[in-house]
Amino acid sequence: MAFENVDLFDAVANASLEKYGWQDRCEAKLIVLSENATYMVKNKETGEKEGVLRISRPGYHTLDELNSEMKWLRQINDYTPLLVANPIKGLDGKNIQEITGPDGNVYFCVICDFLPGEAPDENNEEQMVKQFRYLGETTAYLHRQTEIWNGTDKLDRMVWTYDTIIGEHAAWGDWRAFPEMTSDAENILSEVSRIIKRRLE
């Protein structure tokens, strides 16, 4: 499957809106295509942002892994001061919708609340420092929450190792297959990859 097939993901996005009964009043516009296809869901008349749709790449996450993620989000929402984008239930009462795409693959779709915000400005060092400090505080809350929640051991999540991150069987695919990869960049990154692997062994 060509993950860059935007038309395919657009079709899945439109089909997912029907699972929420939103197909008449909302439209989904692609934000980014990476390990997931992420869409902004807006009201057609008012332009109001009603949610963010995430379409998982087939084979990237299992349904159990995504359900675990939904449970953890609920715990974070209920037991920490952190503001999280909660999943919105479909007409069937489920957080995760399964859509069969035009290619015959099943796609897992989740719409979460829209939370306003902005990406870090890499040209504003002072702002970046503040945002990374806040990111550190947020990460600390998440670590603490996993320590005190007795449901953590029941979560089915991807295991992050050298092999699943940048190895030959990486979850996001082989980084060497990046269309704009140059031979110089590949040589440098290959050396970095070998150093990382050696240090982790």
Language-model features: where?
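Short secondary-structure junctions
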Residues: 17-25, 79-83, 201
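ATP-binding pocket architecture of kinase catalytic cores
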Residues: 43-150
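A cross-family kinase active-site recognition segment
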Residues: 122-184
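An alpha-helical support segment within catalytic cores of ATP-dependent transferases
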Residues: 9-19, 148-151, 166-201
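Active-site acidic catalytic loop and adjacent metal/ATP-binding pocket
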Residues: 34-52, 87, 190, 194-201
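Juxta-kinase regulatory segment immediately upstream of eukaryotic protein kinase catalytic domains
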Residues: 1-27
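Short beta-strand
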Residues: 28-32, 86-89, 153
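ATP-binding glycine-rich phosphate-binding loop
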Residues: 20-42
